[in-house]
Amino acid sequence: MGQVLPLVTRQGDRIAIVSGLRTPFARQATAFHGIPAVDLGKMVVGELLARSEIPAEVIEQLVFGQVVQMPEAPNIAREIVLGTGMNVHTDAYSVSRACATSFQAVANVAESLMAGTIRAGIAGGADSSSVLPIGVSKKLARVLVDVNKARTMSQRLKLFSRLRLRDLMPVPPAVAEYSTGLRMGDTAEQMAKTYGITREQQDALAHRSHQRAAQAWSDGKLKEEVMTAFIPPYKQPFVEDNNIRGNSSLADYAKLRPAFDRKHGTVTAANSTPLTDGAAAVILMTESRAKELGLVPLGYLRSYAFTAIDVWQDMLLGPAWSTPLALERAGLTMSDLTLIDMHEAFAAQTLANIQLLGSERFAREVLGRAHATGEVDDSKFNVLGGSIAYGHPFAATGARMITQTLHELRRRGGGFGLVTACAAGGLGAAMVLEAE
């Protein structure tokens, strides 16, 4: 095993996660239709602070992320500070690491705590797929800039005359990789074919995710970590995630057609995460600061790792790459884990990563390691369901997973939990959590 890297401050304090909260997650254009991500972020941070009863001045830093950014609010973190009654002097900045954005936010706050520049901070993320930055064509954008510089009406009219009808059409945000033009679903199809993952296996994982998420809500396990949202026109509260299909059957999944490779594909809307709106955040502190305030931490951040691979082929292998690093830095193995929570971008991606974590050949030939990371024990894996069921507001998913895993660890009497995710751009993230 490689070098263990303890996550402690200069005084030897562990990094404590004292509280976490999220909004219910909503499918695109449903409960949060028209609510921008910045307002979702304000909603969850304001409620998180109110529930924790931590004085606003105790929070010295807020690091927040948004993947689909709005031009009018480029620093969502600062807008949240200014819009929630937090101390105006609170340091705030925004981060983006695609689907691992709130993993990055947590890591950044942890690094500030370890450096000793702060003693308490908030990390999280929010995204809205219902309020999108609809742009204009490149040609129209260039003409508009030139028109602004033109001095006479005739010059302006001449510039506009260069435009054609198609140049005036609105341009939605890109859903494909900038460097390759591949959509995430195209990559999921690649992975299904590369690793021999069948449609039946994908549908079974998706069904499992929905069944377990529905059971978690039914058992009341999520009530403490999901706030009630009140949104215009305030006719009724929004209480639970609205994507979960608790009454579905495997036969229902089999009815859907492939969404990306129409002829030979196996990836469908049902075995993929839907476009989703929501926000999530966690409060981190040094262990000694939590004790001073009389707070009992949910748990501790034991280690983290970020990785990057090529984007042209099977780029959603982040968990298979980042997990061994995070475990190594924590001084643990897969068998030491009580829980494993992997982001389910697609069932195909999830199953491919599970396969490679247990592959000796992948470990030797690709990772350059002597042995496989370890088999994933199904009894420990995504025990409350995953992103296919809950949905995936890109920047919020990591904070959801961290909070959910820590609560479940505490229900089980403590232990170690792994949270891990793939992300666009061939990125990967993994964190090891500890609860007592």
From Swiss-Prot:
The keyword Signal does not apply. One of its GO terms (biological process) is fatty acid beta-oxidation. Heterotetramer of two alpha chains (FadJ) and two beta chains (FadI). Its EC number is 2.3.1.16. PROSITE patterns: THIOLASE_1 (PS00098), THIOLASE_2 (PS00737), THIOLASE_3 (PS00099). The keyword Acyltransferase applies. Keywords: Acyltransferase, Cytoplasm, Fatty acid metabolism, Lipid degradation, Lipid metabolism, Transferase. The active site is at C99, H392, C422. Its main location: cytoplasm. It comes from the Bacteria. It catalyses: an acyl-CoA + acetyl-CoA = a 3-oxoacyl-CoA + CoA. GO terms for cellular component: cytosol. Pathway: Lipid metabolism; fatty acid beta-oxidation. Gene3D superfamilies: 3.40.47.10. It is found in: Cytoplasm. Catalyzes the final step of fatty acid oxidation in which acetyl-CoA is released and the CoA ester of a fatty acid two carbons shorter is formed. Belongs to the thiolase-like superfamily. Thiolase family. This is 3-ketoacyl-CoA thiolase. One of its GO terms (molecular function) is acetyl-CoA C-acyltransferase activity.
